[in-house]
Amino acid sequence: MKTQTLVVLLTVAACQFCLSQTPAQQEVLQFERDACKAFLEADVAGLERVLTPDFTLTLSNGDVETRADEINELRSGKVHYDVFENYDMLARLYGNDTAVVLGKTRVKGTADGKPFDRIVQFTDTLIKRDGRWQLAAGHVSRIEK
C-alpha cells in the first residue's frame, strides 16, 4: 500500500511540474526532444536546422566541438547512437528569444567502434531566429553511474 501511495504522489508531483511549465517553456523542451531525435537518427538535415552555424559544445575534458564536428561525426559513422535522451529538464526563458535548458542526457552507442553508455549533466543555450529555436551552445559534464 505504501508503494502505491508513493507512486501516486510522485505522479501527481510530476504532473504538477508539467502543468507549471508555460507554453514557451514547453516549446523549448519539445525543441530539446527534437534535437535528441536528430542526433539519435543521425539526421544531418535536422541537425543543420537545430544547430546555429556557430554552435559550440564544450565537453567534460575541456575540448570544444563545433557544428561541423558534430555533423561530420554522424555523417561519417564515427559515432552512432542507440540511445540519446534528455530528462530532468528545466527551461528558463529570458525575453522572447533566449532560453537556457538544464538537464541530464543518457547517451549509448559506439564511437570509433567502441561502445559507450554514459549520463551527462548539460546546459544548453538556445536562441530564437526567424521564429524557430536553435541551439547556440552546450556544455556537458559526465556524471559517474
Label each residue range with its predicted role.
Residues 21-145:
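A beta-strand edge to alpha-helix "cap/lid" segment located at domain peripheries
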Residues 1-5:
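Positively charged n-region of N-terminal signal peptides that target proteins for export
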Residues 7-16:
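Bacterial N-terminal signal peptides
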